[in-house]
Amino acid sequence: MNINATLLGQTVAFIIFVWFCMKFVWPPLMNAIEERQKRIADGLADADRAVKDLELAQSKATDQLKDAKATANEIIEQANKRKAQIVDEAKAEADAERAKIIAQGQAEIEAERNRVKEDLRKQVATLAIYGAEKILERSIDEAAHSDIVNKLVAEL
């Protein structure tokens, strides 16, 4: 191996080239690589953060959906209770109204029956007196007639 001036010149040129590259080419290249690494790392961190935010949002949405369902079920249950209460109140009111109408009808029937009885008593008394007049073939004076009718009405 012969070391000659060409090899020595090539070595010096190579060292200058390496120094030049290390001084002027390497730092911008390393800066670009580091910047790209930083952007990639930031992108991955943002992606991780976005995944966590998505999971949190899904969890919140699920919780809100559960709360909404529970609230809806509670409202439906209250509405059903209120419906049953209204139906019961309406039934009670209808029963009371029915009882009132029945009592009123019975009172009217009783009053009509008493009136008919009284009319019947008077007619029977009048017929009895008329029959007695016919049998006796005589007329009874008005005062006596009144007394007899009143007594017959009281007896009947």
From Swiss-Prot:
Keywords: ATP synthesis, Cell inner membrane, Cell membrane, CF(0), Hydrogen ion transport, Ion transport, Membrane, Transmembrane, Transmembrane helix, Transport. InterPro entries: ATP_synth_B-like_membr_sf, ATP_synth_b/b'su_bac/chlpt, ATP_synth_F0_bsu_bac, ATP_synthase_B_chain. One of its GO terms (cellular component) is plasma membrane. Belongs to the ATPase B chain family. The keyword Metal-binding does not apply. The keyword Cell wall biogenesis/degradation does not apply. The chain crosses the membrane at residues 13-33. It is a single-pass membrane protein. It is found in: Cell inner membrane. F-type ATPases have 2 components, F(1) - the catalytic core - and F(0) - the membrane proton channel. F(1) has five subunits: alpha(3), beta(3), gamma(1), delta(1), epsilon(1). F(0) has three main subunits: a(1), b(2) and c(10-14). The alpha and beta chains form an alternating ring which encloses part of the gamma chain. F(1) is attached to F(0) by a central stalk formed by the gamma and epsilon chains, while a peripheral stalk is formed by the delta and b chains. Pfam families: ATP-synt_B (PF00430). This is ATP synthase subunit b. CDD domains: ATP-synt_Fo_b.
